[in-house]
Amino acid sequence: FVSLTAPIQLKGNHITLFWASEAVLLYWLYLKSGIQLSRLTAQIIWVTMLISLFMDWVNIYSSGQVLPVVANKGLITTLFAAAATFFLALLVKKDVAEEEQPEFKISAIHLQVIALILLFVAGALEINHQFSIRYPLQYLNVLYLMLYVPAFVIVITLLSTKIKSLVLPWQIKLGITAASILSYLFCIPSFFSLQKEILEKAPQFTAHFTVHWISMVLVAVLFYQLIQICRSHLNETNLNNASWKIWGT
């Protein structure tokens, strides 16, 4: 109760930062002491941290205010929450008794995936806000988001093959790769609308459209990754079905 109510005296994103730190600290204390209450409390506080973080997003990014690039409380708080969630996942992996606990629990792989989601959202919200507020062009934020999305997926899938603590199941790699490709294809009409707006109303922003061609190259890399994942992990029947779906897309 004290752990949940103490940070209420703080303001805004400081509550989220406090709960993120406290969740990691309490789980670490549980591993050292074996006190089950610390373990359960850490997980509950982590969930409340996510709720608080969502409220921070609404308050910060819906205000319409011009925020400093990178050095703003929205991005910093989200990155901190992602880091705390990742460290919590590492602690859960060290918990040899974790599989034997029948009560409420959050697995390490779920924490790891949520940490990656938070990391992704941190960049996506920052890019969307900065380009929406600072530039008058409609869909320019979408253009840069569609550069960020495939770049993020490529980097994460590459790191997951190099760093043991970042290893992801192939199903997750397949899902995020396919989702990234589909999101790009879905946004193609926005690219044409932006191109028309730039040519007719703002030719000084023509250089921005170079980002679109870079995005196309990254999406081509994702297509290659998707094919490699399917070949490595799907049987012949599923592979044929997947091939038809890919070409249909």
Question: Model segments located where?
Answer:
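Alpha-helical transmembrane segments of multi-pass membrane proteins
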Residues: 1-249
